[in-house]
Amino acid sequence: MRQVSRVLSTYTADVSGVCSALYEMGGMVIMHDASGCNSTYNTHDEPRWYDVPSMVYVSGLSELEAVMGDDDKLLRDVERAAKELHPRFVAIAGTPIPMMMGTDFKGIARLLERRLGIPVFGFATNGTHSYVSGVGMALAQAAKKFCLPKEQLSGADGGQKPCVNLLGVTPLDFSVTGNVEALKEVFQSEGYQVKSCWAMGSDFEALIRAGEADVNVAVSVAGIETAIVLEEMYGTPWVLGLPVGPKLTRRVLEAVDLASATGKNQLPLALATDGVDGKTERNHRQTYIIGEWVWAMALRCSLIAEYGYDRVSVICPLESEELFADRLLTGREERISGVLDAAVRAGAFLEDEDQIEERLKDAELVIADPIYRRALPKDRAVDFIEFPHEGYSGRIYRKDIPVFIGEQWNQWFESRE
């Protein structure tokens, strides 16, 4: 049955994506939902909850308010809390009940902004989309609102290597097991200055000066919207890629250099990948990688380039195809078409459980979150490498999430192949 999950889980929702993206920016984020509904985010979607303070709340929407379409209590509560806590900004994110109420989040944001005198965002999330759309829209709107105009920036420091921003970094894709630190180290160890990381581990001052970077590196699909916003604001070129394994790491760094030199966007994941000599029978296995598109494509490139795999397909259950086609392609066909071409060659965007089960019928090796083991064929053995994803199974397998940046990916993979 379409759009029904019997044995698989669902990905973190868009409202949690908004909260995750804005978590470290010093604002007050409100989930407009019934009391207690914030526990899903606090418990399963936010590993920083007990270690990094943030103002993330739930509005406590009541049944009567929902039936009557009453927004006055929300306005009063937000106004009172903001005056007491003095946040840098306010963001209100929707859930399924406000969607059915027809809540005007943009109108509420405009009204609160006039009353409070600070920036207020209204995100019409509804809990039916994944975190990818939530993170993408939150980071993009934050960049539009907060990044300083060109005349207030000092420009790059003129070093030998380009200065970069890392875009689309949240615990939902990178967890808190060392990947963010490793990602920064990959660039810094090669002489690249990391201006800001959107949005983990960078202070607000660094974020608002993102226009001083030479190149933006979108390390997840959720970072593409922000890359395009910064390109429109400053003319900064962007690179779409994730440094997984030595060969792809080198390719991503070369793409950064090329983008800085030419001013053109680079898509290292879309380039042809040469295999290696000395293939074995194991390299010919039909292999599937299931997960976030940029991460999965990066693993695919590494398997082909470093291990000689020649039958590697990607299954992306997130709405990346919709993001590419509807929200990013308009007027930008030349910039992003290579991504779509690569996606078509590499695999498929499949959101339904029955579609994923059908595609895996010929699988010989699957690399995915442990929950996907339930979708394997029942009539034969299939090799399965567990690769937990915070944005899918939450905290359940967090301790098993590896550091997959640079050469550390190879060490982890070779210990399990």
Where are these regions (language model features)?
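An N-terminal assembly and electron-transfer interface module characteristic of large anaerobic redox
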Residues: 1-417
